[in-house]
Amino acid sequence: MDTTFQAAIDTGKINGAVVCATDAQGHFVYNKATGERTLLSGEKQPQQLDDVLYLASATKLITTIAALQCVEDGLLSLDGDLSSIAPELAAKYVLTGFTDDESPLDDPPARPITLKMLLTHSSGTSYHFLDPSIAKWRAQYANPENEKPRLVEEMFTYPLSFQPGTGWMYGPGLDWAGRVVERVTGGTLMEFMQKRIFDPLGITDSQFYPVTREDLRARLVDLNPSDPGALGSAVIGGGGEMNLRGRGAFGGHGLFLTGLDFVKILRSLLANDGMLLKPAAVDNMFQQHLGPEAAASHRAALASPLGPFFRVGTDPETKVGYGLGGLLTLEDVDGWYGERTLTWGGGLTLTWFIDRKNNLCGVGAIQAVLPVDGDLMADLKQTFRHDIYRKYSAWKGQQ
C-alpha cells in the first residue's frame, strides 16, 4: 500500500491518501495519512488524519443508521407504506418506454414503496446517469438545470425504473430516506445525525454540503484551486453538479467527515456495542434483504458494464447480495473478506468495509488529482482492501 500510493503521488495522479482501520476491540489500529493537500491559496500542507473528507455515497451508510434508529423509535417500519410520509414517492409511475412521438409510457405502481426498498435500491428510483430511459425522460420533462437549488423531492422528480420491490438499480433512495427521517422527526437530517450518531461517538467535525464552518474549511481536502467551491469534484470524478444543484441535506451523497471519525462509526457497528443501534438491528444490517426478483436484477446489474462499480472490489465469482447499508458478501473469500462483510464506497476514490467474521473494518480515501484516472483509483482502492488484511494478519502473528 505505501509504495503503491507513493508511486501514484510521484506520477502526479494523486495528492495523497487517508487510511483508517481497526478491529472491534481497538487493539489493532492502523491510521495513516500519506502525501499532501493543496490549500485554496495554493500552499501545500502534509495530509493529516483529521483532514475533512467528502464522503459522497459513503454518506449512505450513515443515513441508513439514522433511518434504522427511527425504526427503533417506532417512527418508521422497514416494510410499512411510506405514502403518507412521502406522497411524492407514492405519486410516481413506472416508466415502461416511449411512443413513436416520444411521449412516455408508464404504469401505476403495483405496490407502495417501503423504507427497506429505499435502503436497498429496490424501490425503482434510479440515478438518471445510470438509466438511459430515465435520462431521456429527464431531458424532456425535468426542471431546467439553471434554476435555484432544489430539495430532494424537487431534484428527483423522475418516474420509477421498475415496479417497487421487483428490481435493483443504484439511485437516490437514501436521499429520499433522509427526507423521510426529517419528516418523521421534525428536524433536519444533520440535527438527528448529530444527536443520535455523532454525539454518542464523540464526533464533532461533520457537515452536509456546503461546508460553512471555518474550522472545517481549514481542513477541507476538497477546498483547493481545482475545486474552489468544495464540491468534491476529485471524489466523484469532476463536475459536482449534484451538490451544486441541491438544497438541504442529501442523505445519499452530501456529508463531509474525517477518516478517523468515519472509522468510529464502522467500529461501533463491527463491535455491535449498542451505541448506535440495538444488537438485533445491527445483525439485520448484515442480512441479504433483496427478494428473488430484486436479487435477480441485482445479479444482472453486477454482470453489466457497470458491474465493477457495483461490486466494490469483489470478484465476479463471489456470491454477493445487498444488506442495509451496502453490498453484502454471501460467502468467504480466502484470505480476505469473510461471509457477510458489508462494503460500499464514495465516488471513485473512497471505499469502506465491515468484516464481522474476521473482526476488521476500515476506510480508504484516495485524494485524486483532476482529471481523475478511474482505473488507477480502482486499483489503489483494491490495494488498500487487500493490504490492510495483510497488515492485520501480520499484526496477529506477532501477538
From Swiss-Prot:
InterPro entries per the UniProt record, alphabetical: Beta-lactam-related, Beta-lactam/transpept-like, Diverse_Enzym_Activities
Application in biotechnology: PcEST can be used to directly produce monacolin J through single-step fermentation, which would be easily applied to industrial production with the existing equipment and fermentation process of lovastatin production and beneficial for the current simvastatin industry and hypercholesterolemia market.
Family matches, as SUPFAM superfamilies: beta-lactamase/transpeptidase-like
Record carries keyword DNA-binding: no
Annotated catalytic residues: S57 (nucleophile), K60 (proton acceptor), Y170 (proton acceptor)
Keyword Disulfide bond: no
EC code: 3.1.1.-
Impact upon substituting S57A: Abolishes the catalytic activity
Reaction catalyzed: lovastatin + H2O = monacolin J + (S)-2-methylbutanoate + H(+); pravastatin lactone + H2O = pravastatin diol lactone + (S)-2-methylbutanoate + H(+); mevastatin + H2O = compactin diol lactone + (S)-2-methylbutanoate + H(+)
Domain of life where this protein originates: Eukaryota
Enzyme type, top EC level: hydrolase
Keywords, alphabetical: Hydrolase
GO molecular function: hydrolase activity
Protein family according to the UniProt entry: Belongs to the class-A beta-lactamase family.
Function: Esterase that can hydrolyze the side chain of lovastatin to produce monacolin J. Is also able to hydrolyze the side chains of mevastatin and pravastatin, but not simvastatin.
The protein, known as: Lovastatin esterase
Source organism of this protein record: Penicillium rubens (strain ATCC 28089 / DSM 1075 / NRRL 1951 / Wisconsin 54-1255) (Penicillium chrysogenum)
Classification lineage: Eukaryota, Fungi, Dikarya, Ascomycota, Pezizomycotina
Chain's gene name: PcEST
